Amino acid sequence: MSESELPDDNQLTLEQALINLQCEDLGLRIYAAWWLGRFRVKDPRAIALLINALDDEADRTDAGGYPLRRNAARALGKLGDRSAVSALIRSLDCKDFYVREAAAQSLEMLGDIACVPKLLEMLNTPITSEISSLESDQPFDAILEALGTLGAVETIPQILPFLEHPIPRVKYAAARAMYQLSSDPKTAAHYGDILIKALSNNDLQLRRTVLSDLGAIGYLGAAEAISNTMAENSLKLISLKGVLEKQIPLATPPDLTAGAVRVMALMDDLL
């Protein structure tokens, strides 16, 4: 069950969510795990129960998936407690692709480099030539994004081959990571420009993904391209906000960099 499939309400209470997370009703347990993450409930009891839920065996689909584990893994990243790191690293071995994906994303959010060796091990999964099989191997895009955010420069040799990956979103995740890991501005700009070119892709969902990537890395050179992308203004504004946030620390308040002024003007035009 994804966030888009769940009601966006705050009718549950912390105490009831904790009870529901331990009850026999699997639907209530899944919802409670989602709710705790959605509303950033950073209660130690909640975190402990969510960590326990990563080992749940009761909620399993006919296809072998673990919906409760998925929601628990996603929630733990949002709660920001690094006590979950070890359990999330173990979850990277789960047979459920989406649990592994959620665990990688949450480890990226938690920012603990202890997960880098395991992520690198997953990245070394042999790549086959069939796209259909690649979809079921590893969540390569989530792994690459995590390595970039975590600053794992030692993984650059393993990331580089993914720039030629047959799945576009994986290829662009590699470019995003290389931008973050490149110390030379010209080299970083090269990878940022790969993402700019991707904004003209015919696939709307892919354009949305790349907008998110550019916002995450805050590439100033992409500002105009982001503004002109054929996508929802709301997503372009979020992406430009990411670019702006990278510019703000570069000036002494109340002054702004020329880049920040430029981005703010583009944002105004989208409002």
Where are these regions (language model features)?
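Structural detector for internal amphipathic alpha-helices that build alpha-solenoid repeat scaffolds
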Residues: M1-D9, R29-K42, D62-R82, R90, ...
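Amphipathic alpha-helical scaffolding segments comprising HEAT/armadillo-like alpha-solenoid repeats
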Residues: P7-Q22, V41-D59, D81-D93, D112-E130, ...
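Short inter-helical turns and helix N-cap capping residues of alpha-solenoid HEAT/ARM repeat scaffolds
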Residues: E24-D25, E57-A58, G64-G65, K95-D96, ...
